[in-house]
């Protein structure tokens, strides 16, 4: 839950870690983690109400000295898993990126002298499967290290 505003200081947005495991998570609606993720999605979209979400994905790696920032605004999803039934490769996740948010993150990283590469990549299952279960409909910006 977001903290209260303290004088002139901005409200801090909470940080969430979402580890979903394999893509079969999105069909295992009876699993307690599925209900928890749906609850987190509800909290974020109805209480926190961010303009966008910044996502750090472990499914991509860049060089040790740079962070890759996804500046794409519409991404295909990547089926970065193997050996699942055919219907798992037919899931769709409509999404919207935010170039504006990406550029703000790039600006902050640059001010800290952190090198950045702008890339356009699809969404890996660690993002789209979790966002589907959480029913999130927010702009996002994805980075890779």
Report the location of each language-model feature.
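A short aromatic-anchored loop/beta-hairpin motif
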Residues: 2-116
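Internal, conserved structured core segments that host functional sites
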Residues: 101-145
């Amino acid at each position: 839950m977001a903290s209260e505003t303290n004088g002139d200081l901005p409200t801090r947005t909470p940080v969430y870690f979402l580890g979903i495991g394999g893509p079969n998570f999105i069909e295992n609606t009876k699993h307690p983690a599925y209900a928890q993720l749906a609850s987190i999605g509800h909290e974020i979209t109805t209480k926190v109400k961010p303009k966008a979400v910044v996502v750090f994905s472990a499914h991509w790696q860049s060089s040790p000295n740079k962070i890759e920032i996804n500046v794409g605004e519409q991404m295909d999803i990547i089926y970065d898993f193997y050996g699942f039934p055919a219907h798992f490769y037919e899931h769709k996740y409509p999404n919207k990126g935010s170039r504006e948010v990406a550029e703000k993150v790039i600006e902050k990283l640059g001010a800290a002298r952190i090198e950045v590469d702008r890339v356009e990549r699809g969404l890996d299952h660690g993002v789209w499967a979790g966002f589907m279960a959480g029913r999130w409909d927010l702009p996002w910006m994805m980075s890779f290290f």
